[in-house]
């Protein structure tokens, strides 16, 4: 009896040992991701992955990861700086932010004797759209040329700060004496604009569009006018990436799927962002929909590499850092290339593609495919899940009047700037009607005035353009 008890104890001990050894091998891998939910062009790197549980689909469970458990953690931030602090402190593994704060992230890691790497672009513009300057809605200021001697607020050391400095330099002004630049977060600046405590505010995505959409500001300058590339992307702790390269690739495959889902149904996911963040779906669609302000281009185009170089040099000029970053090693596209390969995509083909998210649609009235996008106008009606597409502004405005007379209400109307191709809120644009009755939209009144002289047209606002379109249809 005693012998059997000893044997049982030995077997039990053996079993406990094997369990203990197994537990030692069953590593728990933390995947701690910092997001910026309200910075909506980071959505495919955080918010959508989290809300749609996309990461779980790609985390590896074979090979050395066979017995691994994952501790996926999400933490939301309103800017890049506090996210960088937590990454350097070892509390986060991934973080999404813009080129300027991302460069500060790399500098902070380097000062700490460590390294972070930029692994993907999430959204950007090779011309600089996304950053912008707004003024109070009732301001007499019409362009940046009117800002000399004025007070302009901006979040310091941001991509918008860099844009503002470039815009001021292009005017031939001294930023220290010709304008009064103060630092303000977008939350503070919104109230300051309403109270007319500042003359203008420069900011990053989505505020140069969000404030005008909410009716208390008007955009007078788009970052595309600087022709200086800007982007948001994702960084990872380099040591983490070396230890768990397959996890980094898994995250990037989730980014790719989020990007594809957004392309398939931009209205649906624009509304999901609104549900989570409170940022209006109409603003989200302006960026993420077809022909949007930015492209959700994940690849490391030369322009985005140059944007990082510019960010580093500007931050040194502003005395925000004294660190020299080697962009050739700071940006690492190896993980993204592998994620593309595993997703069945051609990275090099995507790298060569500079097109905006395409609009593949028929004119809602004629049923014919839209092929000329210079005058495309989109109407999103209350109660409708999809945006209506029109080949011309005059057709869309006339149809909108009819719809409104029938009790329908537009959530938003989008037009394309004839000069730049930028997507605009229709009620924020200036319009020129030529002798043939064609209506063209412009962000800047100066551009509208010049075009009006060329075509012997008149410059009008949105309300007048709608009236003109309706009268033209009635006269046929």
What is the predicted function of each stretch?
Residues 19-26:
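Sec/Tat signal peptide C-region and signal peptidase I cleavage site
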Residues 27-174, 180-183, 199, 228:
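Short, glycine-/small- and polar/acidic-enriched structural segments
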Residues 37-40, 244-322:
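Secondary-structure end/capping motifs
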Residues 49, 130-140, 230-246, 432-434:
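A bilobed periplasmic-binding-protein/Venus flytrap-type ligand-binding module shared by bacterial periplasmic
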Residues 66-68, 151, 155-166, 171, ...:
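Ligand-binding clefts/hinges and TM-proximal coupling segments of bilobed small-molecule sensing domains
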Residues 110, 176, 182, 187-276, ...:
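Pocket-lining segment of extracytoplasmic ligand-binding domains
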Residues 316-360:
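Conserved C-terminal helix/tail region of periplasmic/extracytoplasmic solute-binding proteins
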Residues 362-367:
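Short cysteine-rich clusters marking metal-coordination/redox-active sites
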């Amino acid at each position: 009896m005693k012998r059997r008890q000893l044997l049982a104890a030995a077997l039990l001990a053996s079993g406990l040992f094997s369990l203990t050894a197994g537990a030692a091998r069953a590593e728990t891998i933390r995947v701690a991701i910092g997001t910026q939910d309200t910075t909506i062009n980071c959505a495919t790197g955080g918010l959508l992955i989290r809300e749609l549980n996309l990461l779980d689909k790609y985390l590896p469970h074979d090979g050395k990861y066979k017995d691994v458990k994952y501790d996926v953690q999400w933490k939301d931030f309103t800017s890049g700086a506090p996210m960088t602090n937590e990454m350097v402190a070892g509390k986060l593994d991934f973080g999404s932010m813009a080129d300027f704060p991302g460069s500060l992230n790399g500098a902070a890691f380097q000062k700490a004797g460590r390294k972070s790497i930029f692994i993907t672009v999430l959204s950007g513009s090779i011309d600089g759209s996304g950053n912008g300057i707004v003024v109070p809605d009732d301001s007499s200021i019409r362009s940046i040329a009117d800002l000399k001697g004025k007070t302009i607020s901006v979040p310091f050391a941001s991509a918008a700060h860099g844009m503002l400095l470039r815009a001021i330099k292009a005017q031939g002004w001294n930023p220290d004496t010709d304008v009064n630049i103060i630092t303000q977060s977008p939350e503070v600046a919104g109230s300051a604009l309403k109270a007319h405590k500042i003359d203008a505010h420069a900011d990053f995505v989505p505020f140069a569009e969000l404030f005008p959409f909410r009716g208390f500001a008007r955009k007078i300058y788009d970052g595309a006018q600087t022709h200086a590339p800007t982007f948001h992307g994702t960084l990872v702790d380099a040591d983490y990436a070396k230890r768990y390269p397959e996890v980094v690739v898994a995250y990037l495959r989730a980014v790719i799927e989020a990007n594809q889902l957004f392309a398939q149904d931009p209205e649906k996911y624009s509304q999901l962002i609104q549900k989570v963040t409170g940022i209006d779906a109409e603003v989200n669609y302006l960026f993420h929909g077809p022909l949007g302000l930015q492209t959700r281009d994940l690849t490391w185009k030369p322009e985005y590499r140059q944007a990082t170089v510019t960010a580093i040099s500007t931050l040194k000029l502003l005395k925000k850092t004294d660190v020299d970053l080697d962009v050739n090693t700071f940006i690492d596209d190896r993980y993204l290339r592998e994620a593309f390969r595993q997703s069945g995509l051609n990275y090099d083909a995507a790298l060569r593609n500079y097109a905006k998210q395409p609009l593949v649609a028929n004119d809602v009235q004629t049923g014919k495919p839209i092929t000329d996008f210079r005058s495309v106008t989109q109407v999103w009606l209350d109660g409708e899940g999809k945006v209506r597409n029109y080949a011309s502004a005059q057709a869309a405005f006339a149809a909108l009047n009819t719809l409104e007379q029938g009790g329908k209400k537009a959530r938003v109307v989008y037009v394309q700037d004839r000069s730049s191709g930028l997507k605009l809120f229709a009620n924020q644009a200036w319009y020129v009607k030529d002798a043939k009755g064609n209506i063209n939209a412009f962000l800047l009144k100066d551009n509208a005035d010049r075009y009006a002289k060329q075509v012997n047209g008149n410059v009008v606002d949105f309300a007048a353009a709608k009236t003109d379109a309706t009268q033209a249809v009635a006269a046929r």
